[in-house]
Amino acid sequence: MKEIVIATKNAGKVREFAALFAKRGVEVKSLLDFPDAPDVAETGSTFAENAVLKAEAASRRLKRPVIADDSGLVVDALGGRPGVHSARYAGEDKNDARNIAKLLRELDGVPMEQRTARFHCALAVAIPGRPTAVVEATCDGYIAEAPRGEGGFGYDPVFYLPERGKTMAELAPEEKNQISHRAKALTKLDEQWEEIVGGKGRTE
């Protein structure tokens, strides 16, 4: 395999995948390189289902191997919300500040020990003529009572990591990249890559 498409227009995500595949001599492209790539409605009820929907739709259209990810925040005290609706939790315009404000309102009065949460990442690999493979990983923490830190994006300012005494937004980028849900999923993908390209698709 000489080329793989990452089903995203997010340059940061593309860089993460490019670092992984550089050692394999695989060129990484994104949807920015393919203006005719389909927009896929994320109608799945799980992160894995949405990742598969996006990967398979793009792979069919582009006739190339495609990796798609779907990720979000799962909060136990909210019955798993925001879940697959994480990006648009407060509305359709993907506003991080409003999403965080809504989350904190819903957790108002909930004690810290009950604010357990995890970031979840699912990566789907769709290769024409082969079974779609999925790898998944999580990063566990708590929801802080107020935002802290300037780094990261999304819910990072309120995702507290007790073992580090910091929110995800307070971590240096290299520190976050060692422990984040996407970093863990990328590690799994790397470990299983030969099996995946050999056609033995599996879900974890």
From Swiss-Prot:
<keyword id="KW-0547">Nucleotide-binding</keyword>
<dbReference type="InterPro" id="IPR002637">
    <property type="entry name" value="RdgB/HAM1"/>
</dbReference>
<dbReference type="GO" id="GO:0035870">
    <property type="term" value="F:dITP diphosphatase activity"/>
</dbReference>
<keyword id="KW-0479">Metal-binding</keyword>
<feature type="binding site">
    <location>
        <position position="71"/>
    </location>
    <ligand>
        <name>substrate</name>
    </ligand>
</feature>
<dbReference type="GO" id="GO:0009117">
    <property type="term" value="P:nucleotide metabolic process"/>
</dbReference>
<dbReference type="GO" id="GO:0005829">
    <property type="term" value="C:cytosol"/>
</dbReference>
<feature type="active site" description="Proton acceptor">
    <location>
        <position position="70"/>
    </location>
</feature>
<dbReference type="Pfam" id="PF01725">
    <property type="entry name" value="Ham1p_like"/>
</dbReference>
<dbReference type="GO" id="GO:0009146">
    <property type="term" value="P:purine nucleoside triphosphate catabolic process"/>
</dbReference>
<keyword id="KW-0460">Magnesium</keyword>
<comment type="function">
    <text>Pyrophosphatase that catalyzes the hydrolysis of nucleoside triphosphates to their monophosphate derivatives, with a high preference for the non-canonical purine nucleotides XTP (xanthosine triphosphate), dITP (deoxyinosine triphosphate) and ITP. Seems to function as a house-cleaning enzyme that removes non-canonical purine nucleotides from the nucleotide pool, thus preventing their incorporation into DNA/RNA and avoiding chromosomal lesions.</text>
</comment>
<dbReference type="GO" id="GO:0017111">
    <property type="term" value="F:ribonucleoside triphosphate phosphatase activity"/>
</dbReference>
<feature type="binding site">
    <location>
        <begin position="153"/>
        <end position="156"/>
    </location>
    <ligand>
        <name>substrate</name>
    </ligand>
</feature>
<dbReference type="GO" id="GO:0036222">
    <property type="term" value="F:XTP diphosphatase activity"/>
</dbReference>
<feature type="binding site">
    <location>
        <position position="70"/>
    </location>
    <ligand>
        <name>Mg(2+)</name>
    </ligand>
</feature>
<keyword id="KW-0546">Nucleotide metabolism</keyword>
<feature type="binding site">
    <location>
        <begin position="8"/>
        <end position="13"/>
    </location>
    <ligand>
        <name>substrate</name>
    </ligand>
</feature>
<dbReference type="GO" id="GO:0000166">
    <property type="term" value="F:nucleotide binding"/>
</dbReference>
<feature type="binding site">
    <location>
        <begin position="181"/>
        <end position="182"/>
    </location>
    <ligand>
        <name>substrate</name>
    </ligand>
</feature>
<dbReference type="GO" id="GO:0046872">
    <property type="term" value="F:metal ion binding"/>
</dbReference>
<comment type="similarity">
    <text>Belongs to the HAM1 NTPase family.</text>
</comment>
<dbReference type="GO" id="GO:0036220">
    <property type="term" value="F:ITP diphosphatase activity"/>
</dbReference>
<feature type="binding site">
    <location>
        <position position="176"/>
    </location>
    <ligand>
        <name>substrate</name>
    </ligand>
</feature>
<dbReference type="InterPro" id="IPR029001">
    <property type="entry name" value="ITPase-like_fam"/>
</dbReference>
<dbReference type="InterPro" id="IPR020922">
    <property type="entry name" value="dITP/XTP_pyrophosphatase"/>
</dbReference>
<comment type="subunit">
    <text>Homodimer.</text>
</comment>
<keyword id="KW-0378">Hydrolase</keyword>
<protein>
    <recommendedName>
        <fullName>dITP/XTP pyrophosphatase</fullName>
        <ecNumber>3.6.1.66</ecNumber>
    </recommendedName>
</protein>
